[in-house]
């Protein structure tokens, strides 16, 4: 459901580091580092090195940035490309003319578009740029060269999209394969225009992104009562740097708000631009008592939460152990999590005490670094076997033995990734009924050596109940293991059971 650019990057990193637990995370990590550097360089060129440092640290401390940098998802790579595009465009528009940067920015927008369809968004910055009053032309030489600038937009952008559209077009030209043409139609039309205008999932109200900003953009959103009036004053003065950064951010917000389908990651590309726009104001804001109090309170809240959760785990309180049991976790594996969380709380309290409310910004950076260190070194190694299905699939392998063949029905991608042997599947987006139509005969061919791993609610009533094995739970899904002898020729899944296993468009 996505063009292959992100998968190309993961395959390339696997060639460099042939160990999937590391390789599949590297594109996001490298994209996060690139985004931080680009944010720093844009702010440095538009203001000063001190402002650039504030911009980078502001971006680093926002929760959504850390979460996306640590996930093997496409969105961090997309944001690196949109930020690279803005870097090139703003260098030309505000500090140009710089034709190489301009061409690179347009090319990056094209590559971003074939990475995820909204990669063209940086081009929206051209709208406020064209709307700038003529009085700014004297300080913006590139504005007087708008005709030449526009002439490069389409060729450079199309060149970027040709990274994937070129090979795809050649393949379509030389092939009559209906599956290839359906693949192209799915990506070029259904997953773009149709998905935007007539979203079939994740339907949210118009104001949904205000909720996202108020939560995932902590602690930066706490400063909005001070930032918004300051930004407005600079917009009224017509400072082109603020006009382009803020107007572009508003256009992106409106673009996504207008679509009925909304997810929290959609507005992530705005974040670096807003951090750059906030950076020149942060030195002054951090001298204000109210700002320091809010940021100190945020650090203390994280510290208290860490101590409370960690203490509950370390003391074997009922709510902590009950949560672990519900997720299928072994209680012994939970204990290190408790100590890491207690350590996080101690760091937060120490940072707050050291700052004494006067160095709230520094305490926040220290706490953020501690948070992601604990998350990466303490929490995820303990939780990963259960959240990634590796523990579940290990049990499956042990139960069926090394010589058995394994099939999957109504499966998730992580089940396939964590399986200890080659797996036979019967479709991913196919209905359960269609999958059973193929899985049943497959089991019947070797009923004593073939097993089926299946989502519990996808098992039809005609499967022998006595032979069903409840093998475990993962990510709030219950799974069963069925030997080939549990199926018989007259067992057919009812049409009412035919649901999509991979819900269309889930991979965002």
Predicted regions and their residues:
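Short hydrophobic/aromatic helix or loop-helix immediately within or flanking a transmembrane segment
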Residues: 1-22, 112
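Specific aromatic-rich, kink-prone transmembrane helix
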Residues: 38, 78-95, 274-277
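Transmembrane-lumen/periplasm boundary regions of multi-pass, lipid-linked membrane glycan transferases
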Residues: 107-108, 115, 120-263, 280, ...
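Membrane-interface transmembrane helices that cradle and orient dolichyl/undecaprenyl
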Residues: 45-46, 85-104, 112, 282-285
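Short acidic/glycine- and proline-prone juxtamembrane loop motifs at membrane-interface regions
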Residues: 25-28, 67-78
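Transmembrane-helix signature of polytopic, membrane-embedded enzymes
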Residues: 39-61
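Membrane-embedded architecture of ER/inner-membrane glycosylation machinery
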Residues: 103, 230-508
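Transmembrane-helix motifs of polytopic, lipid-linked glycan transferases
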Residues: 26-46, 84
């Amino acid at each position: 459901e996505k063009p292959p650019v992100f998968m190309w990057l993961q395959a390339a990193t696997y060639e460099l580091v042939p160990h999937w637990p590391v390789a599949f995370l590297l594109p996001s990590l490298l994209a996060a580092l690139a985004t931080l550097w680009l944010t720093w360089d844009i702010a440095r060129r538009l203001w000063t090195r001190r402002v650039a440092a504030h911009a980078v640290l502001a971006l680093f401390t926002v929760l959504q940035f850390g979460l996306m940098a640590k996930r093997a998802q496409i969105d961090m790579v997309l944001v690196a490309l949109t930020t690279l595009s803005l870097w090139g465009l703003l260098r030309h528009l505000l500090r140009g003319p710089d034709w190489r940067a301009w061409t690179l920015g347009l090319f990056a927008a094209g590559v971003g578009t074939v990475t995820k369809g909204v990669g063209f968004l940086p081009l929206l910055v051209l709208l406020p740029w064209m709307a700038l009053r003529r009085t700014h032309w004297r300080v913006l030489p590139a504005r007087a060269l708008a005709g030449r600038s526009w002439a490069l937009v389409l060729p450079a952008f199309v060149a970027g999209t040709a990274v994937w559209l070129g090979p795809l077009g050649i393949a379509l030209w030389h092939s009559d394969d209906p599956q290839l043409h359906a693949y192209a139609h799915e990506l070029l039309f259904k997953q773009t225009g149709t998905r935007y205008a007539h979203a079939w999932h994740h339907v949210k109200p118009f104001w949904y992104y205000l909720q996202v900003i108020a939560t995932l953009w902590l602690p930066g959103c706490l400063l909005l009562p001070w930032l918004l009036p300051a930004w407005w004053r600079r917009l009224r003065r017509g400072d082109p740097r603020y006009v382009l950064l803020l107007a572009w951010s508003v256009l992106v917000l409106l673009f996504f708000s207008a679509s009925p389908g909304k997810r929290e990651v959609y507005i992530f590309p705005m974040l670096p631009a807003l951090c750059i726009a906030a950076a020149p104001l942060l030195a002054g804001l951090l001298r204000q008592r109210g700002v320091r109090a809010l940021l100190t309170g945020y650090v203390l809240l994280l510290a208290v939460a860490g101590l409370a959760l960690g203490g509950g785990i370390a003391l074997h309180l009922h709510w902590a152990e009950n949560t672990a049991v519900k997720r299928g976790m072994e209680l012994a594996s939970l204990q290190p999590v408790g100590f890491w969380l207690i350590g996080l709380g101690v760091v937060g309290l120490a940072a707050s005490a050291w700052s004494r409310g006067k160095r709230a910004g520094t305490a926040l950076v220290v706490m953020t670094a501690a948070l992601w260190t604990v998350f990466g070194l303490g929490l995820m190694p303990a939780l990963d076997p259960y959240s990634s299905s590796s523990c579940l699939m290990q049990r499956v392998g042990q139960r069926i033995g090394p010589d058995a063949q394994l099939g999957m029905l109504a499966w998730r991608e992580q089940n396939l990734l964590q399986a200890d042997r080659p797996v036979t599947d019967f479709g991913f987006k196919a209905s359960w009924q269609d999958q059973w139509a193929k899985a049943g005969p497959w089991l019947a061919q070797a009923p004593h050596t073939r097993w089926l791993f299946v989502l519990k609610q996808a098992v039809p009533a005609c499967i022998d109940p006595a032979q069903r094995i409840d093998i475990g739970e993962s990510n709030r899904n219950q799974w069963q293991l069925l030997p080939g002898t549990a199926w018989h020729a007259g067992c057919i899944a009812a049409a009412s059971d035919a649901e999509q296993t991979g819900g269309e468009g889930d991979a965002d």
